[in-house]
Regions:
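Short, hydrophobic-biased segments on the C-terminal half of alpha helices
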Residues: 46-51
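N-terminal helix-turn-helix DNA-binding core of bacterial DNA-binding proteins
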Residues: 2-44
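Accessory beta->alpha helical hairpin/"wing" motif in late/C-terminal subdomains of nucleic-acid enzymes
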Residues: 75-80
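Amphipathic alpha-helical dimerization/coiled-coil segments
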Residues: 84-97
Length: 97
């Protein structure tokens, strides 16, 4: 990968991936979807999910799946506002190059 995958870029990609699912999505699927855009390990991604939860950009809930709990992540209003900010910043950046 040519670009540095700093915290803001990872946050933007994760928020974009999670925002596609209205009812939220689970960690493994988020990892698979993010990997379509950039090469990232689960050990890198889960701290991003925790940080976004702490920053109130994601809400977390558990749901039963095949007899066990699966943790789901859903974008909050604050998360959507942050994603929109990242999108605007990206448009401004790309116009300059």
């Amino acid at each position: 990968m040519v670009f540095n995958t700093g915290a803001a870029l990872l946050d933007a990609i994760v928020l974009a991936v999670v925002s596609r699912e209205k009812e939220g999505t689970y960690g493994y699927k988020i990892t698979q979807d993010v990997r379509k855009a950039i090469d990232v390990s689960e050990s890198t991604l889960y701290p991003v999910l925790r940080r976004l939860q702490k920053d109130e950009c994601l809400e977390v809930y558990d749901r039963q799946f095949d007899g066990r709990n699966r943790r789901y992540y859903k974008v909050t209003e604050r998360g959507m506002a942050q994603l929109n900010l990242y999108h605007e910043e990206w448009k401004n950046y790309s116009r300059k190059i």
